[in-house]
């Protein structure tokens, strides 16, 4: 499954994929090794702490491919240094430089993450970044590890690095944002505007706690707001939806319907005003073409707020002409069903149109109510209320072998007509518990 995800990420066109933490387990080591053998068009990266055994494991796992990256991380905030690592800042710098030199024995592509950078003293951050770049780090990652930062704060940090670190031009600035306060994507976009040129994220925003930056959201923000951001990616946008759905299934993590870009409602319209506007010109209420992420077309949700235009659109999509049905009658019945079900589907409309056409003639017999209870010994008891002309007859407690026969015995007792069941078939005209029968 990890290989399947990696192949999909390669197909979508990610530049670098971090595929595991080899020291964590033999299974993770093997999966990193397997992915490294199979991925050809994206650079493979694996994670390591500032420990020799971690770096050795990462280098050995990826040695089966030609070009790879080792991503080292170490906390730099005072809180983490004092309470977690129990060291001083000078010792942190020494550990970081030693680990970078160790990683450079395996590859010339080393990334360093200053863990909890968003809560690190800016003077200390500038100091360690300068020394890391001098030691050979090509990518400096600024993580908002606990999702604490705001866009303005992250912008301040990155601008300070560009202004105060003299060798900053020798490295790419990256950000790794978490979504604890719901600002991961906003922070990532702000970082791009401040000069960051690598964004770390995950498809669907999957990740620790509240998740990471949703990659698909950043990608489409860059595409849609290119006039503001002025950058581009190598991503194949039309693979976004397929990749999102596949990862959702593999990870058993359903995508919320209101999720930006890939949620089932992202390109759906329920309001009649919006639906009419979209049918006239989709740009009235859509800033993205759904086809740009791999979807086929716009989706109109049929609800009690939908207008006649949406109903006529769906009937047309199913091949019906305006002359095939009465829009006023159909729309009236549609609203009744929508009030009951909440959302109506195209097959419901078809059923309503069919039922309307079949019930034009006055009915002498009309079934008002029936109830069936199955009891032991395969016996069933049926209660039936039947309208005959203007008079209502009621028959109850008719027992027979099976529920269908019990109903027909009850009907026969009321009408005294011989009822012969020639064919019995139960078909749901639609889906779900509210389907029309």
Swiss-Prot record:
Catalyzes the condensation of the acetyl group of acetyl-CoA with 3-methyl-2-oxobutanoate (2-ketoisovalerate) to form 3-carboxy-3-hydroxy-4-methylpentanoate (2-isopropylmalate). Residues 1-241 form the Pyruvate carboxyltransferase domain. One of its GO terms (molecular function) is 2-isopropylmalate synthase activity. This is 2-isopropylmalate synthase. It catalyses: 3-methyl-2-oxobutanoate + acetyl-CoA + H2O = (2S)-2-isopropylmalate + CoA + H(+). It comes from Buchnera aphidicola subsp. Uroleucon rurale. GO terms for biological process: L-leucine biosynthetic process. Keywords: Amino-acid biosynthesis, Branched-chain amino acid biosynthesis, Cytoplasm, Leucine biosynthesis, Manganese, Metal-binding, Plasmid, Transferase.
């Amino acid at each position: 499954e990890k290989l399947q995800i990696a192949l999909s990420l390669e197909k979508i066109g990610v530049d670098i994929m971090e595929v595991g933490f080899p020291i964590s387990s033999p299974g993770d080591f093997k999966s990193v090794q397997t992915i490294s053998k199979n991925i050809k068009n994206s650079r493979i990266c694996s994670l390591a702490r500032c420990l020799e055994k971690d770096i050795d494991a990462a280098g050995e796992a990826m040695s089966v491919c030609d070009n790879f990256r080792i991503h080292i991380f170490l906390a730099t905030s005072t809180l983490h240094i004092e309470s977690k690592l129990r060291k001083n800042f000078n010792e942190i710098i020494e550990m970081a430089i030693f680990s970078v030199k160790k990683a450079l024995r395996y590859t010339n592509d080393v990334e360093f993450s200053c863990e909890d950078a968003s809560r690190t003293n800016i003077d200390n951050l500038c100091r360690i970044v300068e020394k890391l770049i001098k030691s050979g780090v090509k990518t400096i990652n600024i993580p908002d590890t606990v999702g604490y930062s705001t866009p303005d704060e992250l912008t301040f940090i990155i601008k300070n690095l560009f202004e105060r670190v003299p060798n900053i031009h020798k490295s790419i600035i990256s950000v790794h944002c978490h979504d604890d306060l719901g600002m991961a994507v906003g922070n990532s976009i702000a970082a791009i505007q401040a000069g960051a040129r690598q964004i770390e994220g995950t498809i669907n925003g999957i990740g620790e706690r509240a998740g990471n930056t949703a990659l698909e959201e950043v990608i489409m923000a860059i595409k849609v707001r290119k006039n503001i951001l002025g950058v581009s990616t190598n991503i194949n946008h039309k693979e976004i939806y397929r990749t999102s759905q596949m990862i959702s299934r593999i990870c058993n993590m359903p995508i919320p319907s209101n999720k930006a870009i890939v949620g089932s409602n992202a390109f759906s319209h329920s309001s009649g005003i919006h639906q009419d506007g979209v049918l006239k010109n989709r740009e009235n209420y859509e800033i993205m073409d759904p086809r740009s992420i791999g979807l086929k077309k716009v989706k109109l949700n049929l609800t009690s707020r939908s207008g006649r235009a949406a109903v006529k659109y769906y009937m047309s999509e199913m091949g019906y002409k305006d002359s095939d049905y009465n829009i006023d009658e159909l729309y009236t019945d549609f609203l009744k069903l929508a009030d009951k079900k909440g959302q109506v589907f195209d097959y419901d409309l078809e059923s309503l149109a069919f039922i309307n056409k079949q019930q034009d003639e006055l009915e002498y017999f009309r079934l008002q109510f029936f109830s069936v209870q199955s009891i032991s010994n395969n016996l069933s008891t049926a209660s039936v209320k039947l309208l005959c002309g203007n008079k209502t007859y009621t028959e109850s407690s008719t027992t027979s072998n099976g529920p269908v026969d019990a109903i027909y015995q009850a009907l026969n007792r009321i009408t005294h007509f011989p009822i012969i069941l020639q064919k019995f078939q139960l078909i749901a005209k639609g889906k779900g518990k509210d389907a029309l029968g």
